[in-house]
UniProtKB/Swiss-Prot annotation:
PANTHER family: BETA-GALACTOSIDASE RELATED. The lineage of its organism: Eukaryota, Metazoa, Chordata, Craniata, Vertebrata. This is Beta-galactosidase-1-like protein. InterPro entries: B-gal_1-like, BetaGal1-like_ABD1, BetaGal_gal-bd, Galactose-bd-like_sf, Gly_Hdrlase_35_cat, Glycoside_Hdrlase_35, Glycoside_hydrolase_SF. It comes from Mus musculus. Keywords: Glycoprotein, Glycosidase, Hydrolase, Secreted, Signal.
Amino acid sequence: MPPDLPSLLLRLVVLLLLSQAEARSFVVDREHDRFLLDGVPFRYVSGSLHYFRVPPVLWADRLLKMQLSGLNAVQFYVPWNYHEPEPGIYNFNGSRDLIAFLNEAAKVNLLVILRPGPYICAEWEMGGLPSWLLRNPNIHLRTSDPAFLEAVDSWFKVLLPKIYPFLYHNGGNIISIQVENEYGSYKACDFKYMRHLAGLFRALLGDKILLFTTDGPHGLRCGSLQGLYTTIDFGPADNVTRIFSLLREYEPHGPLVNSEYYTGWLDYWGQNHSTRSSPAVAQGLEKMLKLGASVNMYMFHGGTNFGYWNGADEKGRFLPITTSYDYDAPISEAGDPTPKLFAIRNVISKFQEIPLGPLPPPSPKMKFGPLTMSLDGNLLSFLDFLCPQGPIHSVLPLTFEAVKLDHGFMLYRTYLTSPVLEPTPFWVPNNGIHDRAYVMVDGVLKGVLERSLKQELYLTGTVGTRLDILLENMGRLSFGSNHSDFKGLLEAPLLGQTILTEWMMFPLKVDKLVKWWFPLQLMKRALPQASSVPAFYSAKFPVFGLLGDTFLYLPGWTKGQVWINGFNLGRYWTMRGPQQTLYVPRLLLFGRSINKITLLELENVPHNPQVQFLDKPILNSTLHWGYNFLLSETQGSFEPMELSGH
């Protein structure tokens, strides 16, 4: 063999690989109003799935079911705040392992439509923007404000190089990337900002990747930008022909694309469970596919807002989003195929081949209980453990952002400096409670005040009376004209016309306390019922037989947070609804050892403090919207008080 032959063969192999990679392309064919994938006419039928709402061990299951439904792509967001919890500190491990999710999609031959933001909406906490941005109170989010752009640039210089190898023309599965998200619905209409983002994406990802925008029919003017492919979003109730004609005003040539075809809708606490009928969703999909459109179904599997990650809207009043993000999607929150999935699959089969073989059956479910919950202690009893560094002192109350607290709860404390002998109104001006205040006098809960509601709470006290306000962040605004949603007491409270000053702020590390549960066992104490909320309750339980998914049911409990074996399952609000059960994936349970459930009940404990685990969810039982609980001094129990919104 000639001495140069091995090196010659190596060069040939490299050239062959390069030519194959060069052949990979995903482009817009404007002349024929279509996409071309590797030079061949192509359209995607995609579905949305958010890796951050699904435990990692279930990613493969959900993606396989999507592929077996006839989809050839998956669309998902990247929430900035999920990956950069503090400036310059990044997390891409575990449930945040974006690369692992891309690989799981590739295993089932799903192409990827990526939506990295920086703003994503997604009904996610602050629309995916990190709340630490608000530590600069003068920052203008989603604009060309240099302070915002500096943070965005730093983030994308970390994120985008990670995904570069996964671009389709580089041999990966990412065929297109969205710039921003529904920017036309935002008040700023800052084209300088959009041009900056487009330039940043091009600088970090090159010229070959297809960049696009998505907006609603009325947001196209401010959301579209030359050089970015314009797409639209709408649902089954909209007129397909009319909406696509609006899109043609901004994108005269090229494929029609609905980037968010709504298979269902989100739920707010206190409103009816949202649904979309299967026939309507299927009919709308068929109309679009007959027009040759590419479609992404939002959502195909919704998942769960575990922990504190739910977002919120403001539509005349503050509307936090439920823990369940089931979305009435084709694949349920528990990962099960629904009749809607089969209706969609039938439509897709008319236009392209469906993978052979049946879909996997629903996962095993189990039910057990009831379990009796035991009182571990009043929240105030554990203040030294919840805030080991001690309080922050200020004449006027500080916000969550000012003390660098992103989620959860903060306790505000002050003492009366003069007697208040007659019942006197306690209030916070300018809707300054963000979002829910549990007001205690000398450790006894006197009432609850809530953002956007007109409320009255009358207090009395003597010199030295302790006033505690437990402030709950119920999720930052994820959509609308203002994402600068500061949390905590935004104004100084008043007692009558007297401004209360000299505050102590205790940022609470509730999740750490639950995980380090030994302090509660050391300090467990019996407290009278009247002073037992906010309080921790817990129970230990075994699980016998085959583990299955289940749904935690909390009859009679009011509002709070729940943990299973230290994992923050999310918020419950049974008194307001519509969600009555919380999805518990079987992976959170131990089959051969003792499990533990922990509740932080904020308002009212049932006379029979029990919980149950059901084999079916209850998502559609709205009970009350405007209500409060005030302590009746005559009866020694909590009674509802009707309230009206602004």
